[in-house]
């Protein structure tokens, strides 16, 4: 592994660690009285405004994609990586446990690999890669359960969590042709824009946005939202788009397995939640599985299957 490739891996790891922390900070916002849809909307508004401001200073700034085909692709990214993904994940928490949701949503690298492999021949998993993926999934189970081997099945909640999982898998597929044509700033700005645009029907028909809740927000809540909007959304989505182009969609998406590891570490640090030996064993299995699944004999070609 070259020094530059190692750098890409370290940056990807950092992004996923930050995303893992967002569950803890989102939980704090939920306890403050904000709804899941409000949290998503506010963090994406912050991210979009800042990224738009930066984009306007660039000589290469453009408002629209070169064709409606690519504009629709951007809309698809905004839905699958923005509004629909976050709504499905957060609504799942209303019907099922955090454990179930984490297990299902964070298994998305497996589904993303299978979906991408159906369109890109060079990305299809070999036996060693599939073994590594399964080892990582076992590690994921151990990390999320953290010594409490009890699952409470909920058809509605688990279906919503699986829907969020599939959304991120589709997002990982759609980002490949987008990266071939546009830079990370343009793509990420479009993701935020269409994510916000497509959340509007939810507020019109399901749950109106409670503007009065904004007036009651404390400085601590605003700082929390700024972290989610500036760091976890604007910076992390921007960097994630970039590293998916550099490492390949499957390699980058495999890092999602680390997401619950980061979540539990932050929960231990900020919420005094325990860490067990099962968590440590699961972490080792996740890292081992990721190493095996990244052992590829061919480069990540970007040619679509005809």
Name each model-derived stretch.
Residues 29, 39, 43, 92, ...:
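Hydrophobic/aromatic residues within transmembrane alpha-helices
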Residues 31-84, 109-115, 167-174, 188-209, ...:
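Transmembrane alpha-helices of multi-pass small-molecule transport proteins
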Residues 4-9, 33-41, 64-71, 145-170, ...:
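Juxtamembrane helix-entry segments on the extracytoplasmic side of multipass membrane proteins
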Residues 17, 22, 46-50, 104-119, ...:
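Alpha-helical transmembrane segments of compact multi-pass small-molecule transporters, enriched
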Residues 1-42, 79, 151-180, 198-201, ...:
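Glycine-/small-residue-enriched transmembrane alpha-helix faces in small-molecule transporters
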Residues 51, 55, 109, 115, ...:
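Hydrophobic transmembrane alpha-helices of multi-pass small-molecule transport proteins
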Residues 22-23, 52-105, 142, 229-247:
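Specific transmembrane alpha-helical segments of multi-pass solute transporters/efflux pumps
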Residues 15, 39-42, 82, 86, ...:
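Helix-helix packing/entry segments at the starts of transmembrane helices
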């Amino acid at each position: 592994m070259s020094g530059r490739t190692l750098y890409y891996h370290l940056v990807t790891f950092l992004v996923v660690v930050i995303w893992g922390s967002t569950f803890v900070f989102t939980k704090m916002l939920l306890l403050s009285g904000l709804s899941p849809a409000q949290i998503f909307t506010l963090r994406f508004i912050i991210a979009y405004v800042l990224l738009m401001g930066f984009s306007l200073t660039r000589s290469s700034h453009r408002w629209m994609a070169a064709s409606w085909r690519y504009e629709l692709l951007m809309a698809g990214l905004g839905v699958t990586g923005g509004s629909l993904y976050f709504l499905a994940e957060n609504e799942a928490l209303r019907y099922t446990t955090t454990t179930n949701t984490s297990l299902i949503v964070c298994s998305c690298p497996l589904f993303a690999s299978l979906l991408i492999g159906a369109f890109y021949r060079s990305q299809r998993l070999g036996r060693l890669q599939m073994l590594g993926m399964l080892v990582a999934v076992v590690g994921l189970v151990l990390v999320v359960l953290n010594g409490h081997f009890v699952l409470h099945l909920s058809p509605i909640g688990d279906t919503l969590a699986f829907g969020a999982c599939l959304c991120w898998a589709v997002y990982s597929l759609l980002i490949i042709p987008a990266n071939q044509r546009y830079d990370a700033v343009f793509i990420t700005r479009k993701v935020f824009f269409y994510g916000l645009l497509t959340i509007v029907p939810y507020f019109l028909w399901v749950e109106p946005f409670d503007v009065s809740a904004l007036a009651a927000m404390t400085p601590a809540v605003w700082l929390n939202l700024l972290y989610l909007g500036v760091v976890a959304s604007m910076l992390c989505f921007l960097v994630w788009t970039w590293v998916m182009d550099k490492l390949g969609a499957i390699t980058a998406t495999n890092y999602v397995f680390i997401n619950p590891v980061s979540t539990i570490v932050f929960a231990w640090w900020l919420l005094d939640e325990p860490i067990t030996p099962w968590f440590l064993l699961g972490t080792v299995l996740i890292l081992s599985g990721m190493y095996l699944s990244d052992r590829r004999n061919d480069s990540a070609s970007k040619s679509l299957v005809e």
